[in-house]
Protein backbone atom coordinates (compact mmCIF):
# COMPACT_ATOMS: atom_id res chain seq x y z
CA UNK A 1 0.00 0.00 0.00
CA UNK A 2 1.36 3.39 -0.99
CA UNK A 3 1.52 5.87 1.88
CA UNK A 4 2.36 9.49 2.58
CA UNK A 5 4.18 10.47 5.75
CA UNK A 6 2.22 13.12 7.64
CA UNK A 7 3.85 15.46 10.15
CA UNK A 8 1.60 16.59 12.99
CA UNK A 9 2.05 19.41 15.47
CA UNK A 10 0.00 18.86 18.61
CA UNK A 11 -0.80 20.69 21.82
CA UNK A 12 -2.33 19.08 24.89
CA UNK A 13 -3.23 19.63 28.50
CA UNK A 14 -1.51 16.64 30.08
CA UNK A 15 -3.45 16.74 33.36
CA UNK A 16 -5.81 13.88 32.54
CA UNK A 17 -3.37 11.84 30.47
CA UNK A 18 -1.00 9.14 31.73
CA UNK A 19 1.69 10.53 29.46
CA UNK A 20 2.19 10.26 25.72
CA UNK A 21 3.03 6.59 25.27
CA UNK A 22 0.35 3.97 24.82
CA UNK A 23 -0.28 1.90 27.96
CA UNK A 24 -2.96 -0.69 28.37
CA UNK A 25 -6.01 0.33 30.36
CA UNK A 26 -5.18 4.02 30.86
CA UNK A 27 -5.69 7.14 28.80
CA UNK A 28 -2.64 8.45 26.93
CA UNK A 29 -2.20 11.04 24.19
CA UNK A 30 -0.87 8.46 21.76
CA UNK A 31 -3.82 6.12 22.36
CA UNK A 32 -6.33 8.94 21.80
CA UNK A 33 -4.68 10.07 18.55
CA UNK A 34 -4.28 6.53 17.26
CA UNK A 35 -7.92 5.73 18.09
CA UNK A 36 -9.03 8.78 16.11
CA UNK A 37 -6.83 7.80 13.16
CA UNK A 38 -8.22 4.26 13.20
CA UNK A 39 -11.72 5.66 12.73
CA UNK A 40 -10.60 7.72 9.73
CA UNK A 41 -8.27 5.19 8.08
CA UNK A 42 -10.14 2.04 9.04
CA UNK A 43 -7.13 0.22 10.45
CA UNK A 44 -4.60 0.62 13.30
CA UNK A 45 -1.99 3.30 12.59
CA UNK A 46 1.12 3.98 14.67
CA UNK A 47 1.91 7.57 15.66
CA UNK A 48 5.52 8.39 16.56
CA UNK A 49 6.23 11.45 18.72
CA UNK A 50 9.36 13.54 19.15
CA UNK A 51 9.32 12.91 22.90
CA UNK A 52 7.37 10.69 25.26
CA UNK A 53 6.08 13.17 27.81
CA UNK A 54 5.26 11.76 31.23
CA UNK A 55 1.96 11.64 33.07
CA UNK A 56 0.65 15.15 33.77
CA UNK A 57 3.17 16.91 31.49
CA UNK A 58 1.77 19.30 28.88
CA UNK A 59 2.81 20.13 25.32
CA UNK A 60 2.55 23.35 23.37
CA UNK A 61 4.24 21.94 20.26
CA UNK A 62 4.69 18.18 20.30
CA UNK A 63 5.74 16.90 16.89
CA UNK A 64 4.65 13.48 15.63
CA UNK A 65 4.32 11.54 12.40
CA UNK A 66 2.28 8.72 10.90
CA UNK A 67 1.88 7.10 7.49
CA UNK A 68 -1.43 7.75 5.74
CA UNK A 69 -2.73 5.74 2.76
CA UNK A 70 -2.37 7.77 -0.43
CA UNK A 71 -6.02 7.00 -1.21
CA UNK A 72 -6.81 9.44 1.63
CA UNK A 73 -4.60 12.25 0.32
CA UNK A 74 -7.64 14.52 0.17
CA UNK A 75 -8.23 14.34 3.94
CA UNK A 76 -7.51 17.55 5.92
CA UNK A 77 -5.89 15.66 8.78
CA UNK A 78 -5.93 18.47 11.31
CA UNK A 79 -9.66 19.09 10.92
CA UNK A 80 -10.51 15.40 10.70
CA UNK A 81 -8.60 14.54 13.88
CA UNK A 82 -9.82 17.54 15.85
CA UNK A 83 -13.37 16.50 15.04
CA UNK A 84 -12.77 13.23 16.88
CA UNK A 85 -10.35 14.19 19.66
CA UNK A 86 -11.34 15.44 23.10
CA UNK A 87 -10.87 19.18 23.75
CA UNK A 88 -7.71 18.67 25.84
CA UNK A 89 -5.67 17.62 22.80
CA UNK A 90 -5.56 19.57 19.52
CA UNK A 91 -3.80 19.08 16.21
CA UNK A 92 -2.34 22.49 15.39
CA UNK A 93 -1.14 21.54 11.92
CA UNK A 94 -0.81 18.55 9.62
CA UNK A 95 1.30 18.45 6.47
CA UNK A 96 3.02 16.00 4.18
CA UNK A 97 6.63 15.33 5.15
CA UNK A 98 9.59 13.77 3.37
CA UNK A 99 9.26 9.96 3.23
CA UNK A 100 12.18 9.47 5.60
CA UNK A 101 11.18 12.11 8.14
CA UNK A 102 11.20 10.81 11.72
CA UNK A 103 9.75 12.96 14.50
CA UNK A 104 12.05 11.50 17.15
CA UNK A 105 15.27 10.63 15.35
CA UNK A 106 15.44 13.80 13.25
CA UNK A 107 14.99 16.10 16.26
CA UNK A 108 18.13 18.12 17.02
CA UNK A 109 17.08 19.76 20.28
CA UNK A 110 14.06 20.47 22.45
CA UNK A 111 12.93 23.23 24.75
CA UNK A 112 10.92 22.46 27.86
CA UNK A 113 9.35 25.21 29.95
CA UNK A 114 8.65 24.95 33.68
CA UNK A 115 6.35 27.51 35.30
CA UNK A 116 6.52 28.50 38.98
CA UNK A 117 3.80 30.47 40.80
CA UNK A 118 5.59 33.06 42.95
CA UNK A 119 2.74 34.74 44.82
CA UNK A 120 1.66 34.00 48.37
CA UNK A 121 -1.86 32.74 48.83
CA UNK A 122 -3.90 30.48 46.55
CA UNK A 123 -3.02 29.88 42.94
CA UNK A 124 -5.30 31.43 40.34
CA UNK A 125 -7.78 28.59 39.63
CA UNK A 126 -7.42 29.20 35.89
CA UNK A 127 -3.68 28.43 36.18
CA UNK A 128 -3.61 25.69 38.81
CA UNK A 129 -3.24 22.86 36.26
CA UNK A 130 -0.16 24.44 34.67
CA UNK A 131 2.02 25.85 37.47
CA UNK A 132 3.82 24.65 40.57
CA UNK A 133 3.38 26.76 43.68
CA UNK A 134 6.22 25.84 46.05
CA UNK A 135 5.79 26.84 49.68
CA UNK A 136 7.04 29.28 50.72
CA UNK A 137 6.88 30.98 47.31
CA UNK A 138 9.71 33.44 47.93
CA UNK A 139 12.79 32.24 46.02
CA UNK A 140 16.33 33.59 45.69
CA UNK A 141 16.40 33.98 41.91
CA UNK A 142 20.03 35.12 41.78
CA UNK A 143 21.15 31.96 43.60
CA UNK A 144 19.05 29.87 41.22
CA UNK A 145 20.74 31.55 38.24
CA UNK A 146 24.15 30.77 39.74
CA UNK A 147 23.19 27.13 40.24
CA UNK A 148 21.77 26.89 36.73
CA UNK A 149 25.12 28.01 35.31
CA UNK A 150 26.72 24.95 36.90
CA UNK A 151 24.41 22.67 34.93
CA UNK A 152 25.08 24.14 31.49
CA UNK A 153 27.20 22.13 29.09
CA UNK A 154 27.92 18.45 28.44
CA UNK A 155 27.68 16.44 31.65
CA UNK A 156 26.73 13.08 33.04
CA UNK A 157 23.26 13.80 34.44
CA UNK A 158 22.87 10.53 36.34
CA UNK A 159 21.99 12.50 39.49
CA UNK A 160 19.01 13.99 37.67
CA UNK A 161 17.35 10.96 36.10
CA UNK A 162 14.56 8.64 37.16
CA UNK A 163 16.26 5.58 38.63
CA UNK A 164 13.32 3.34 37.76
CA UNK A 165 13.86 3.66 34.01
CA UNK A 166 16.33 1.39 32.13
CA UNK A 167 19.14 3.24 30.37
CA UNK A 168 19.41 3.14 26.60
CA UNK A 169 22.54 3.04 24.49
CA UNK A 170 23.38 6.71 25.05
CA UNK A 171 23.83 6.39 28.79
CA UNK A 172 23.33 9.49 30.94
CA UNK A 173 25.51 12.09 29.18
CA UNK A 174 23.58 14.98 27.65
CA UNK A 175 24.37 18.51 26.42
CA UNK A 176 22.30 21.16 28.18
CA UNK A 177 22.64 24.18 25.90
CA UNK A 178 20.92 26.74 28.05
CA UNK A 179 18.68 27.58 30.98
CA UNK A 180 16.93 30.92 31.05
CA UNK A 181 13.98 32.45 32.85
CA UNK A 182 11.33 35.01 31.95
CA UNK A 183 8.21 36.34 33.66
CA UNK A 184 5.28 34.26 32.49
CA UNK A 185 2.61 36.56 33.89
CA UNK A 186 2.01 38.86 36.88
CA UNK A 187 2.62 36.03 39.36
CA UNK A 188 4.67 33.55 37.35
CA UNK A 189 8.26 32.84 36.39
CA UNK A 190 9.06 30.45 33.55
CA UNK A 191 12.34 28.52 33.40
CA UNK A 192 13.28 27.11 30.00
CA UNK A 193 15.69 24.24 29.40
CA UNK A 194 17.18 23.47 25.98
CA UNK A 195 19.14 20.29 25.29
CA UNK A 196 19.90 17.72 22.62
CA UNK A 197 17.87 15.22 24.63
CA UNK A 198 16.60 14.66 28.15
CA UNK A 199 16.62 11.70 30.49
CA UNK A 200 13.30 10.63 31.99
CA UNK A 201 12.22 13.27 34.55
CA UNK A 202 15.48 15.17 33.98
CA UNK A 203 13.87 18.60 33.62
CA UNK A 204 11.67 18.07 36.67
CA UNK A 205 14.66 16.89 38.68
CA UNK A 206 16.71 19.91 37.58
CA UNK A 207 13.82 22.22 38.47
CA UNK A 208 13.41 20.58 41.86
CA UNK A 209 17.10 21.17 42.50
CA UNK A 210 16.94 24.83 41.44
CA UNK A 211 13.93 25.45 43.69
CA UNK A 212 15.84 23.87 46.59
CA UNK A 213 18.58 26.40 45.90
CA UNK A 214 16.03 29.20 45.77
CA UNK A 215 14.72 28.13 49.17
CA UNK A 216 18.22 28.12 50.65
CA UNK A 217 18.26 24.37 51.28
CA UNK A 218 21.01 23.74 48.72
CA UNK A 219 23.84 26.02 47.56
CA UNK A 220 25.18 26.43 44.01
CA UNK A 221 28.35 24.68 45.22
CA UNK A 222 26.20 21.77 46.39
CA UNK A 223 24.70 21.53 42.89
CA UNK A 224 28.16 21.07 41.40
CA UNK A 225 28.86 18.31 43.92
CA UNK A 226 25.52 16.60 43.19
CA UNK A 227 26.31 16.68 39.47
CA UNK A 228 29.81 15.27 39.98
CA UNK A 229 28.72 12.51 42.38
CA UNK A 230 26.31 11.01 39.80
CA UNK A 231 24.06 9.86 42.65
CA UNK A 232 20.32 10.52 42.45
CA UNK A 233 19.88 9.80 46.17
CA UNK A 234 21.72 12.98 47.21
CA UNK A 235 19.73 15.29 44.92
CA UNK A 236 16.63 17.26 45.99
CA UNK A 237 13.11 15.95 45.28
CA UNK A 238 11.52 15.99 41.83
CA UNK A 239 9.34 18.95 40.88
CA UNK A 240 5.72 17.98 40.14
CA UNK A 241 4.58 17.33 36.59
CA UNK A 242 1.93 20.03 36.27
CA UNK A 243 4.41 22.88 35.78
CA UNK A 244 6.22 21.25 32.84
CA UNK A 245 5.45 21.80 29.16
CA UNK A 246 7.18 20.63 25.98
CA UNK A 247 7.48 23.95 24.20
CA UNK A 248 9.43 23.38 20.99
CA UNK A 249 11.25 20.72 18.98
CA UNK A 250 14.00 21.77 16.57
CA UNK A 251 14.76 19.97 13.31
CA UNK A 252 17.64 20.49 10.83
CA UNK A 253 15.63 23.07 8.88
CA UNK A 254 15.29 25.10 12.10
CA UNK A 255 19.05 25.33 12.58
CA UNK A 256 21.01 28.50 11.78
CA UNK A 257 22.87 28.22 8.46
CA UNK A 258 25.83 25.87 8.72
CA UNK A 259 24.97 24.77 12.24
CA UNK A 260 23.94 21.16 12.78
CA UNK A 261 23.98 20.96 16.55
CA UNK A 262 21.69 22.74 18.99
CA UNK A 263 19.49 25.61 17.96
CA UNK A 264 20.09 29.07 19.29
CA UNK A 265 18.30 30.48 22.31
CA UNK A 266 15.32 32.43 20.90
CA UNK A 267 16.13 36.07 20.15
CA UNK A 268 13.24 37.37 22.23
CA UNK A 269 14.36 35.52 25.35
CA UNK A 270 16.70 37.04 27.89
CA UNK A 271 18.73 34.08 29.13
CA UNK A 272 19.56 33.97 32.82
CA UNK A 273 22.45 31.72 31.85
CA UNK A 274 23.52 29.96 28.69
CA UNK A 275 26.41 27.71 27.75
CA UNK A 276 29.69 29.48 27.04
CA UNK A 277 28.18 32.96 27.02
CA UNK A 278 31.21 34.52 25.37
CA UNK A 279 31.51 31.94 22.61
CA UNK A 280 29.09 33.53 20.15
CA UNK A 281 27.38 30.99 17.92
CA UNK A 282 29.41 28.18 19.48
CA UNK A 283 27.48 28.45 22.72
CA UNK A 284 24.78 26.06 21.49
CA UNK A 285 26.81 23.70 19.36
CA UNK A 286 27.45 20.10 20.29
CA UNK A 287 30.74 19.38 22.03
CA UNK A 288 33.24 18.62 19.29
CA UNK A 289 30.96 20.04 16.60
CA UNK A 290 29.12 17.99 14.02
CA UNK A 291 25.67 16.47 14.20
CA UNK A 292 23.67 15.84 17.35
CA UNK A 293 23.53 12.11 18.10
CA UNK A 294 20.28 10.40 17.24
CA UNK A 295 18.06 9.99 20.28
CA UNK A 296 18.12 6.63 21.98
CA UNK A 297 14.88 4.75 21.15
CA UNK A 298 14.39 4.17 24.89
CA UNK A 299 14.82 7.82 25.84
CA UNK A 300 11.84 9.40 27.53
CA UNK A 301 11.53 13.06 28.40
Sequence positions of predicted segments:
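Structured-RNA-binding interfaces characteristic of tRNA pseudouridine synthases
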Residues: 1-286, 296-301
